[in-house]
Amino acid sequence: MADETELKRLYWHSRRGMLELDVLLVPFVQEVYPGLDAEDQARFRKLLECEDQDMFGWFMQRGEPEDADLRRMVRMILDRVQPD
């Protein structure tokens, strides 16, 4: 489980300055990240290291990350906002 300092740091790293990313990443880190297992938390931190334009394309479904870990995290975030 994430400690409060880590959550605050991730919150600020999730605020990208691009509204489309902010509305996906900030609620995810606030509501979902604390309950993720250690592997998925690491995947989310890895996602935050990516370029904004790459993430924008993935979240707008214009492409997928080549990395399987990133692909899993993108799908998890999209599934949260696009229910069946």
From Swiss-Prot:
Please name the InterPro entries in this protein's record.
SDH, SDH_sf, SdhE_FAD_assembly_factor
Keyword set, alphabetical order: Chaperone, Cytoplasm
Gene Ontology CC, one term: cytoplasm
Q: Which superkingdom?
A: Bacteria
The record ties this protein, via Pfam families, to: Sdh5
- Its chief place of residence is cytoplasm
Q: Where in the cell is it found?
A: Cytoplasm
Q: Which family does this protein fall into?
A: Belongs to the SdhE FAD assembly factor family.
Biological role stated in the UniProt entry: An FAD assembly protein, which accelerates covalent attachment of the cofactor into other proteins. Plays an essential role in the assembly of succinate dehydrogenase (SDH, respiratory complex II), an enzyme complex that is a component of both the tricarboxylic acid cycle and the electron transport chain, and which couples the oxidation of succinate to fumarate with the reduction of ubiquinone (coenzyme Q) to ubiquinol. Required for flavinylation (covalent attachment of FAD) of the flavoprotein subunit SdhA of SDH and other flavinylated proteins as well.
PANTHER family reported in the protein's UniProt record: FAD ASSEMBLY FACTOR SDHE
**Name of protein:** FAD assembly factor SdhE
From what organism does this protein derive?
Pseudomonas aeruginosa (strain ATCC 15692 / DSM 22644 / CIP 104116 / JCM 14847 / LMG 12228 / 1C / PRS 101 / PAO1)
